[in-house]
Amino acid sequence: MRILDRSVYVGPSLHAHFPVIRLDLDLGPLEEWPTGRLGSAYIDALAAALPGLAEHGCSYNAPGGFFRRMREDEGTWLGHVLEHVAIELQNIAGEAVTFGKTRSAGPPGVYTVVYEYAQRDEGIAAGELGLRLLSSLLPERLRPPGAVPEGWSWPEARDQFIRFAQRRALGPSTASLVRAAQERGIP
C-alpha cells in the first residue's frame, strides 16, 4: 500500500468547492483484503486507536455508520478507510473537517482518496500518518515492507502529530478574523 501521487487543491476543484487533498493510492496485494476479510481484530484495533471514528456516519449518515460499513458483507477497502482516518486525525488536532470521497481509479487496486483539510501541511501529514497507522495494524504477513519503522509507536506518533498541528494553527484572534472574512466572502 503506497501513495503514488498527491495533489493539494487550495480552492474550488473538480472534487469540492473548498480545499481538499487528493491521494492516488495503490493498495497492491491489499486490494484482495477488504476490511471484512481483515476481520474484527483489525477493525477493533482501529477503533481503539481512533475512537472518534465511531462518530463518522459514512454513507449511513448516522454515528457508527463507518464501522457498520467496515463490518458489513465484504466491508470496505483500505483507501476508504484512509479517507476517514485522515479526516479523524485532523479532528483530534482541533480542525473541523468532515468531507471525504474515495473512488476506484483505473487499474485494480488503485484509488483516488480525497479529503478536506483546514491547514495544508497538517492535511498532508494526516494522510501520511493515516497510512502508517493502517499499515501498523495489518497482520505481519500483509504489512508492506518498510511501511512501519522499527520501534514505531502509535501513541507517540499521534501526540507528535497533534503538537505539529497546534504549532501551525492560527491563534484565537487571528482565527476569528479569518473566519469572519471567509463568511463575508473576503479572500
Model-based region annotation:
Residues 1-187:
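Preference for protein termini
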